[in-house]
Amino acid sequence: IQGEGKTVSGDESISWGCGDIFVLPGGERQIHQASKEMAILWVVTNEPQLAFENLQGPEKGAAPTEMIHYPASEIKKQIELIYKVGRGDDIAGSALIFSSSMQEETRNVLPTLTLAMNSLPAGGSQRPHRHNSVAVSLVIKGENCFSMIDGERKDWAPWATTVTPPVSVHSHHNEGDEHS
């Protein structure tokens, strides 16, 4: 979210900056260190799921994904490409799906975790839809945006984390002047 730094996972390391996304394999010690100024990271793991199901993380070297780094500049380029291509009425929304070579077939970053960056054009809406699993979202930019979840309006706020329960019918709306 803010700052820059370095992350070490096992024998690998990446240097990251504001807006970058990275995926780390389990089973390794991980160290995050800011460079000069304070950094803020938004971290999502499948550790709660593993604990709930009474499972252990993978053994060292047996993780279902590798260390992956998606720089903000490449993410921006891909989002712009999505807007260039456009979308038809049959498409629920515009999303950049992140995956890894090990999870490419399922379009996930982990066997049970999908990572996507959704975007709505100014004045746009995403039709009502539902997911079979929970959706955890980080609002990056959302002035005058909101979601309708099971008929209830939820206004967006920058850097807020939202949780949409499984099978809840929901839609997203941008009444602002910029894409979200």
At which residue positions do the language-model features occur?
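A short beta-strand-loop-beta hairpin characteristic of the jelly-roll/cupin
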Residues: I1-C18, R130, V134-P158
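Ligand-binding loop in jelly-roll beta-barrel domains
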Residues: S13-D20, G26-F52, P166-S180
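Short histidine-centered beta-strand/loop micro-motifs
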Residues: Q33, R107-N108, S125-H131, S137, ...
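A short, N-terminal "cap"/entry segment at the start of jelly-roll beta-barrel domains
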Residues: A51-A116
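Extended hydrophobic/aromatic segments used for targeting, binding, or gating
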Residues: E143-S180
